């Protein structure tokens, strides 16, 4: 009994000092908050993440080689949030955002806040101010590699300033992490890959900006281009693989494959075919795809074309997939993602 009285006294003192709700039992009914998520624009990736999308109030890192689809994935997430009335911001440290492409992905440019800062300190100060406002749902920083410290910009070309960017990121994340959680704002950091020199064993790849982001991120996505999508001889898109390298919300290390079409973003038709086959909703016999005894086409690209021309059927398959999402998730995650019909795509 002495322990329980001492605990009650300590809890009441904490609540008097820091306010009601500053400490509570995790299982208490009023303390458990459902995690809000935002879709990535890819149903397969939403399933692989285990919670139906990317979590709000958390730090997300998307990294990969050049032209792998990092910014596309971030912009699609912004478009999905805007569809639900969310306010989004984009800190364009690379000064390379293409508004025409963003609009094609479904981003509402009139309601997208954009900043093109001069230095890393300015970018992170803007990020901190927007997060603390509590009015932003998603904030994208593109990219960590472009967050150049002021001292480096003002210095001479060739000056050696080791660890300065890592210290900048570490300090910023220490400040940001609490306000991100309180404001329920999702902050997506896009990052690039560098090679470590002299690595004999293991992967020589690393991300820029030091180790702080790896620790603070709740979800880390590794996105890679694994092939091309062709129509006859013309390349019209990339086959992309995303691996959930870190996930604090659900089991990690799941991976998913989908097509990113040039000027369109993630190919929902191709992805729904892959997921439908995996779940047994779409039948595949040889090269033919069919749904409810109706033939969709011979080869994956022809099936995609048929579904694009028949949006009602596409919606029907998507609804069936969403209704069976739990069953799909189990089978899908066990097998590590939808099968890639790269050979068929290349033959079309």
Swiss-Prot record:
GO terms for biological process: DNA recombination; DNA repair; SOS response. The gene is recA. GO terms for molecular function: ATP binding; ATP hydrolysis activity; ATP-dependent DNA damage sensor activity; damaged DNA binding; single-stranded DNA binding. Signal peptide: none annotated. Transmembrane segments: none annotated. Keywords: ATP-binding, Cytoplasm, DNA damage, DNA recombination, DNA repair, DNA-binding, Nucleotide-binding, SOS response. It comes from Rhizobium meliloti (strain 1021). Can catalyze the hydrolysis of ATP in the presence of single-stranded DNA, the ATP-dependent uptake of single-stranded DNA by duplex DNA, and the ATP-dependent hybridization of homologous single-stranded DNAs. It interacts with LexA causing its activation and leading to its autocatalytic cleavage. This is Protein RecA. One of its GO terms (cellular component) is cytosol. ATP binds at residues 64-71. SMART domains: AAA. It holds the Pfam family RecA_C.
């Amino acid at each position: 009994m002495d322990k329980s009285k001492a605990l009650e006294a300590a809890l009441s003192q904490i609540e008097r000092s820091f306010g009601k709700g500053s400490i509570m039992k995790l299982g208490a009914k009023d303390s458990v908050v459902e995690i809000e998520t935002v879709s990535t624009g890819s149903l397969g990736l939403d399933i692989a993440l285990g919670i139906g999308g990317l979590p709000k109030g958390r730090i997300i890192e998307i990294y990969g080689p050049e032209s792998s689809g990092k910014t596309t994935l971030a912009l699609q997430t912004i478009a999905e949030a805007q569809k639900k009335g969310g306010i989004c911001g984009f800190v364009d440290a690379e000064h390379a955002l293409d508004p025409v492409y963003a609009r094609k992905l479904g981003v509402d440019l009139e309601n997208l806040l954009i900043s093109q800062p001069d230095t890393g300190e300015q970018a992170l100060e803007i990020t901190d101010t927007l997060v603390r406002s509590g009015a932003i749902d998603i904030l994208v920083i593109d990219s960590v590699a472009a967050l150049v410290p002021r001292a480096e910009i003002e210095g001479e070309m060739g000056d050696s300033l080791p660890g300065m960017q890592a210290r900048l990121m570490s300090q910023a994340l220490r400040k940001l992490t609490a306000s991100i959680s309180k404001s329920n704002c999702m902050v997506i950091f896009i990052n690039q890959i560098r090679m470590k020199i002299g690595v004999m064993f293991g992967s020589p790849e690393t991300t820029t900006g030091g180790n702080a982001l790896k620790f603070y991120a709740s979800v880390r996505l590794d996105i890679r281009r694994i092939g091309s999508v062709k129509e006859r001889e013309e390349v019209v898109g990339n086959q992309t693989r995303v691996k959930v390298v870190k996930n604090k919300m659900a089991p990690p290390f799941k991976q998913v494959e989908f097509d990113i079409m040039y000027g369109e973003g993630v190919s929902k038709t191709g992805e729904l075919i892959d997921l439908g086959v995996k779940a047994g909703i779409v039948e595949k016999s040889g090269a033919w795809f069919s749904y409810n005894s109706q033939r969709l086409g011979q080869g994956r690209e022809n099936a995609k074309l048929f579904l694009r021309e028949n949006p009602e059927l596409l919606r029907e398959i998507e609804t069936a997939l969403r209704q069976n999402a739990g069953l799909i998730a189990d089978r899908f995650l066990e097998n590590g993602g939808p099968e890639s019909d790269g050979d068929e795509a290349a033959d079309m």
